């Protein structure tokens, strides 16, 4: 038994001098491996008298347990040391200046379109699209725009050939929808439109959203209620809205909707030309001739339509005074949204 105790003390002394995991494992194999010194001691039990066998077995097991615990403790210390060294090497200096990340965002026109579409989808309107190169028939004739109307003039419209134009509005989508679908109809038609015009409030290409509702017992009061709710939602405030009589060949009666100037709260400023009001959209009850062109019985059904310029609404919502800024790709401007 004394030999076992001496062997244990020797092994523990060697452990105290270990400086690395490799040497530690060598000591483990030397004493606890299959051919280790303490393992070999267990083989001597068979040669001892019966009364001494339990004593030797107990002594060897105590020695092996003590040695294994010491090895485990030493190993844990090495692993903790390695972890601390690794953490020190990978340490992040949080006092250093951060690296800027260029994060993209939606164009203000896209944001405005999404906002418009979201409101009308919540109110049961579907979204319809149509071709940007439109025939004279869908762009003018079916919308009660006669051949002598100024909108057909070369200086107002981009002509592809004698019978096709770059659409001047998305109203053609309304006719196409009525041709393929019977009432009730609730649609909006967003998209690009084109006109021969370019200044701080006009560009040759801009975005428009037109809406159409056709059903039984539809009145101008329904139109006013819907548009008033839309404008309050879009500008996120309770606005004063007025409807002025106007003229559009495809609606009768027709009106233009104005809102109290969002820049000066109706007090009068440069944006509203000191009137206190801003024109935001056109609207009216669908003309019977337009319903007829879409194969809708105007005696049975009524409808209303409206149209708005997306850039115009964007300018008012974000306080932009030059329409051309939307299309100049100036990152100093676009990063603000």
Curated annotation (Swiss-Prot):
Q: Gene Ontology terms, cellular component aspect? A: cytoplasm
Report the subcellular localization.
Cytoplasm
Catalyzed reaction equations: tRNA(Phe) + L-phenylalanine + ATP = L-phenylalanyl-tRNA(Phe) + AMP + diphosphate + H(+)
Q: Where does Mg(2+) bind?
A: 252
Cysteine pairs bridged by disulfides in the record: none
Q: What cofactors does this protein use?
A: Mg(2+)
State the signal peptide span.
Answer: none
Q: What is its EC number?
A: 6.1.1.20
Query: Which SUPFAM superfamilies does the UniProt entry name for this protein?
Result: Class II aaRS and biotin synthetases, tRNA-binding arm
Keywords for this protein: Aminoacyl-tRNA synthetase, ATP-binding, Cytoplasm, Ligase, Magnesium, Metal-binding, Nucleotide-binding, Protein biosynthesis
**The record's free-text note on cofactor binding:** Binds 2 magnesium ions per tetramer.
Q: Give one GO term, molecular function aspect.
A: phenylalanine-tRNA ligase activity
What superkingdom heads the lineage? Bacteria
Under the heading Gene3D superfamilies, the entry gives: Bira Bifunctional Protein, Domain 2 (3.30.930.10)
The cross-references to InterPro entries, in alphabetical order and at most eight, read: aa-tRNA-synth_II, aa-tRNA-synth_II/BPL/LPL, Phe-tRNA-synth_IIc_asu, Phe-tRNA_ligase_II_N, Phe_tRNA_ligase_alpha1_bac, Phenylalanyl-tRNA_Synthase, tRNA-bd_arm
Family according to the record = Belongs to the class-II aminoacyl-tRNA synthetase family. Phe-tRNA synthetase alpha subunit type 1 subfamily.
Q: Which PANTHER family match?
A: PHENYLALANINE--TRNA LIGASE, MITOCHONDRIAL, PHENYLALANYL-TRNA SYNTHETASE
Q: How does it assemble?
A: Tetramer of two alpha and two beta subunits.
The protein depicted here goes by the name Phenylalanine--tRNA ligase alpha subunit
